[in-house]
Structure formats: structure tokens, C-alpha cells
Amino acid sequence: MQGRDACVALWLNLMQGEKTSMSTTVKPTEAGTAFLTTPVSESADKIFTLEQRDDEQRWIAESAATFAQREIVPNVEAIDHQEPGVMPGLLKKAGEQGLLSIDVPEAYGGAELGLLTSAMVASEFRDGSFGTAHGAHTTIGTLPIVFYGTEAQKQQYLPKLASGEWIAAYALTEPGVGSDAMGLSTRAELSEDGKYYILNGTKQWISNAGFADLMIVFARIGKERPSAFIVEANWPGISTGAEERKMGIKGSSTRQVYFENAKVPVENLLGEIHKGYKIAFNILNIGRLKLGAGAAVGSRNALNLAATYTTERKAFGKFLHEFGLIKKKLARMAAETYAAESEAFRTAANIEQARRSAGENTEAAFNAIEEYAIEASIAKVHGSEVLAYAVDEGVQIFGGYGFMQEYPIEKAYRDARIQRIYEGTNEINRLVTSGTLFRRVMSGKLDLMARFPTIEARVKSGQAPDFAGEAIPAELRTAVNALERAKDVTIYAAMRIAMKYMQAIEQEQEFMDYLANLLIDVYAIDSALARATQAVRRGDENSATHIKLAQLATWLAFSRIRLNLDQMIMTNINEDQVEKELARIRAYLGDFLLNGVTLQRELAAIVVEKRGYPL
């Protein structure tokens, strides 16, 4: 059974409650932040890569892509102009085809396929506006009830959300405080009869607000930390403002939501009282991860548009793809995308397996998501910035035509900008990445203290071992050794500077930014090199392409790593020690010697032949 017919059969089985092998197709979990201390030679066979998708996962992703091609693409103009009923109608159609139910347990009308599969599906919709609406519904709108709802709440709401009968929204952000869950001003006061919480306040920039039937709302009860509530949008006292006029994702509904003495039954408190901030943080981690996966696929789409255009457009008597600077752009777009998607789906698989291991234990489920907070933030930041790079270069390749609305790269450029802002700005996520690293060290979850003396001795000696050895394919050994040296100097520099700042370290935001940049590049190329190593070990027919993509991703990241290390040392080490520490780190880090121009030309040729992403 092939293609669409297989997809249809699979979805029929799923919607009828039949089990598939999908629910168990996940690699063993690696601990959070393990990428920093585990060599690629050990991790390569443990991590999940897209090449490990089974037939069912491929079919489901294909069905989402088919839905996008048949239902979304023909309606792009109507979506962008917010023609009445178009977006909610598309969401309901998606529900009819099972595309809203992937994360929902079977007991409540869902497919129960898990985070990994839902991330694959969410990344296939190819339209920023629909992707925003779909994510607001399935991730931040539905998952709080899946993860933290009572049995009664799940029975009451999840079947409607899974089918698309109801559409969900997530109301956290407020005027003046953004997404600071600890600074909310919306209040919830218990009524005199003890039957209701009375909500008063304003929420801002709420996706799906114009047509949502249900909202996850965060508000303070007294002066304590915020609590979460399941709120039906048609209850008295709830209203919305006008649609916001936006730069991009114009077709998504974005409004303010007002609560004026809105009565919410006490049984609609979600999770524990005063613990809503935990729900907010953990659901945001899932949202960040899915955003990263979607951004990576968005980069693929931008590359596909650009690569195809270079085979059609001529300048100075030659096709665009024949020019060296165009080859450079195509190759770099492909390599950066490869790294971004590698880290995103690796993280999705780890979170899914950890949650599955937690079972019905709510506290363990909280911890399972929190375990990968660093990786989720990295996936979001790196994925969104790779997308920004890809669409920007896409517009540049199209030239003046890329500035015209008739060409899809123009819309892709506008829609991409928001990705660096929502689910926490990239600046906030960088601080989350570095801050969480130090909290993991201080709690003993990450044993950098114990490792530091060995790493310090290596760095001071200037002699790095052969980290790769025979376990790594010959073509990747130089890149892997460069990566492992980068891990060592990242740990060395971070711990040296941490000893200077001690408890005040999180106030040094510039240092935290440098460190986050290092962690982002290390995780990205660790994921890329592990994926390429895995491809070679299993004899993948595209292993040569994997190698080129991973090598170029490493070469590009290595220069950024060197720059961030230099600037971190120059600005945070005592002045009389700077010269010595710079010399020490530079000597140990060394170089990653590679003819990047030759590699870019080789990779660009594959991109042009494929008319897009080479895998």
C-alpha cells in the first residue's frame, strides 16, 4: 500500500482506535544537556533522526503535506485577507482528517501518537498563518488539558478539541508584561458562594481569539503565583477587541481578550492552585520545540523556492545557479537547515520518551518536559534564526521579484519574522538556555564540577585527545574532533567565569548571551554530526550528502564559536588574565581546516539537481 491510500487507511485505523507501531517508535532517552558531555562517538546510535521515521510516520506527515497542498495553498489569499470563516473552516477540516488529534489520548477521541509525530505534522503546513492557528489550538491550547487536566475536564473538552468541533486559544500575554508569567495582573477572586472564580483583566496578542471556543487563561488568585483556568469563550463577561494589523501571519486571528467579572466554575481550575506558572513554562517548552521543527521545515521550503528559481532565471547569459555567490547561498541554506532539523527532532524524541516513562505521574511529567528546557529553547532560537537567514537569502536570490507579493518568498519573509518573538523572544530563550545550564550544574544534574579539573588540565596543556577515533567515519573525524574541543573550551570558559560572578551570574546578561550562542552552535553541530555518522553506519544511500551537510554546518558554526569565545573571554576575564586565557583557549580549540568554497560548490550542485533541499 503506497502514498495517499496508505495515509487514508492509516487514519481510518487510528480514528477507529486501532493501535499502530507508531506509539513505540522512539529511541532511548538521553539525559537533558547530555550533548555537552557525551562524545558523538557514543551518542550517534542513541539519538533519533528523521531517517528513522517508520512508514506510518512518513504517511502521516505526507497526509499533512497533502492537506496543505489541497486546502491551504489554494486559499492563501483568502487566509491572508482574513475572509470570514476561512481559517476556522480550515481548522475544522483539519480536525475531520485527524490533524488536530495527534497529541490527544485515544480515550478522549485522539490518535495518541505523541510529540514526535505531532511535531512532524505541525511542520508540514507551509503557511505561517495556518501554522500559527494550528499550533495555538493543538499545542498551547490543548496540551495543558492533556497533561494537567482532571478526568472530568478531559472528558468534557478533549473530544471537542480533537475533532475540531471546538477551537482553542492560550491567554497568557498581557499589556505591559508580555509573557512574564510571574508578572501577570489579571485577577481571579473566589465568589462568596465558593462556586466561581471571578476573572478581571486584559490579555494581549491572543492567537485564535477571534473564533476560539475555549481558552487556557492565566490569572492570580490573591497575591500568590498565577493559576490556570479552562475558560469557555462564550461565557458572560468575556469579549475581544478588533483584529490586530500585523506585519506577517496576517491570516491568523490576533486580538486582545477582556475579562470583566467573568464567572469561571471552580471545577475549571486547571492543575494545582498557584501552580499555573509551571503549566505555562512547560507548555511553552513544547511550543518552542514545535516552533523549531516548523521553522526548520520552513527553511526547507524557502530553499526549495530559491533553488528552483535559480534554474529558471538567467542573468548575464547564465543561469543564477552557475554563479559562485549563489552556490554559496544555496549550500549554506541547506547546511544550516540540516543542523536545525536534526536538533529539533532529536529533542522531540527525547521529550516524548521521557514523558512516556513518566506515565500518569504528574510531577514526573513536569520534570520530563523540564529536563529538556535547554534543548527546547535552542531548537526555537536556532530554528527561527536559520529560517530568518533562509528567507532573507531567498528574497536576495529572487532579487526585485522577491520583493513582490506575487512571489511566495515575499510572504515567507514576512511570516518568518514573528518566530523570533513568540514563545518567548530569542533573547529570553538565550537567557533560559544559559541560566538553566547553571541551575543544572548547581543541582548536580549536570556534572561539570567533577569534569572541570580534567578539562582544565587538557586546555592548559594545549593537547586534545583524538575524540573521534575509529568509531567515527573517516570523512567526519576532523569535524568531530573540532566539535569535542569546542565542548571542552565552552565548559572551561563558562566555569572559569562562573567562579568570578558566583550568585550574581544571571545578572551578567551579555556573558549569558555569549554562552547561549556557544551552546546553540555546539548542540546544532553535535546533532548534525551524529546524524551524519548514523547515516554512514547504516549504509544510507545518501550518506555522502549527509557528510557534506554536516561538514559545512560545522565549518560555519566553528567560526562563530571562535568569535563568541574570544568576546566572552575579553569581556569577562580580569584584564591581567585576558591575554593568557585567550592564547590558551585559541591554542586548544585550534582550527577546522576545510576548503569551504569547494564544499559549498559540491553541495550546491546537489541542491540544484534536487531543485531544493538535498535529502
Protein language model features and the residues they cover:
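C-terminal helix-coil-helix/basic helical segment that borders enzyme active sites and/or dimer interfaces
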Residues: 76-82, 338-382, 395-398, 502, ...
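N-terminal glycine-rich flavin-associated loop
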Residues: 133-152, 178-181, 190-193
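Glycine-rich beta->alpha junctions and the first turn(s) of the following alpha-helix
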Residues: 24-26, 48-53, 58-60, 239-341, ...
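Glycine-rich phosphate/cofactor-binding loops in nucleotide/flavin-utilizing enzymes
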Residues: 23-46, 120, 140, 282, ...
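A short core secondary-structure module
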Residues: 195-240
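C-terminal amphipathic alpha-helical interaction region
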Residues: 461-469, 474-615
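Amphipathic, small/basic residue-rich leader segments at the start of a protein or domain
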Residues: 12-136, 146, 152-156, 160-163, ...
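A short, Trp-centered hydrophobic/proline-enriched beta-strand micro-motif
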Residues: 164-172
